């Protein structure tokens, strides 16, 4: 299966992606992990990304797209994958479509993990990170709504909504059900 996970910060995408990857026997592909791997291994793309990250800038979409494109060529992704944190914009979604098209593939599912904003604020404040102030958290939601919400329309034909409030295993069961598993 080829799956994209969407949802705001604190919705549990990373945790659920890990559980789904384990259950389905396919890799979880996170852009954060891709950046760290390529930087620590000194790849050309990693060194390029490091320049932006060291300067505190966002890595350009073209570079992120190239990292994802390379990762999709890895043998473990041949049977499927779970994309966690990518795409973040319609532009990246279109780039992903092209990556899949050149491999004669398509997405099987797009899951949106939905949690009320007040619950997300509570979750994120509970993590105890210094930078997780309420203002910072609410700004992250605004950025998510502005940039990622259009993806919900873009993927409307394949989109399945998962209620991500509740115990980890309850949310996992809902995600599996949304995937028809």
UniProtKB/Swiss-Prot annotation:
InterPro entries: Adenyl_kin_sub (IPR006259), Adenylat/UMP-CMP_kin (IPR000850), Adenylat_kinase_CS (IPR033690), P-loop_NTPase (IPR027417). It holds the Pfam family ADK. Keywords: ATP-binding, Cytoplasm, Kinase, Nucleotide biosynthesis, Nucleotide-binding, Transferase. GO terms for cellular component: cytoplasm. It catalyses: AMP + ATP = 2 ADP. It is found in: Cytoplasm. Its EC number is 2.7.4.3. Pathway: Purine metabolism; AMP biosynthesis via salvage pathway; AMP from ADP: step 1/1. Residues 30-59 are annotated as: NMP. Monomer. Catalyzes the reversible transfer of the terminal phosphate group between ATP and AMP. Plays an important role in cellular energy homeostasis and in adenine nucleotide metabolism. Consists of three domains, a large central CORE domain and two small peripheral domains, NMPbind and LID, which undergo movements during catalysis. The LID domain closes over the site of phosphoryl transfer upon ATP binding. Assembling and dissambling the active center during each catalytic cycle provides an effective means to prevent ATP hydrolysis. Belongs to the adenylate kinase family. This is Adenylate kinase. It comes from Mycolicibacterium vanbaalenii (strain DSM 7251 / JCM 13017 / BCRC 16820 / KCTC 9966 / NRRL B-24157 / PYR-1). The lineage of its organism: Bacteria, Bacillati, Actinomycetota, Actinomycetes, Mycobacteriales.
């Amino acid at each position: 299966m080829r799956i994209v996970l969407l949802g705001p910060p604190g919705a549990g995408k990373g945790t659920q992606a890990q559980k789904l990857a384990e259950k389905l026997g396919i890799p979880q592909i996170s852009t954060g992990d891709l950046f760290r791997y390529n930087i620590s291994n000194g790849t050309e793309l990693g060194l390029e990304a490091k320049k932006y990250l060291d300067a505190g800038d966002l890595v350009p979409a073209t570079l992120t797209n190239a990292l994802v494109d390379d990762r999709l060529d890895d043998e473990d992704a041949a049977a499927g994958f779970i994309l966690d944190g990518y795409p973040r914009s319609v532009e990246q979604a279109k780039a992903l479509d092209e990556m899949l098209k050149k491999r004669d593939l398509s997405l099987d599912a797009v899951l949106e993990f939905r949690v009320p904003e007040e619950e997300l604020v509570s979750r994120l404040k509970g993590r105890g990170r210094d930078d997780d102030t309420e203002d910072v958290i609410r700004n992250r939601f605004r950025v998510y709504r502005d940039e990622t919400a259009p993806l919900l329309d873009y993927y409307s034909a394949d989109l399945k909504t998962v209620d991500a409030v509740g115990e980890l295993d309850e949310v996992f069961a809902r995600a599996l059900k949304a995937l028809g598993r």
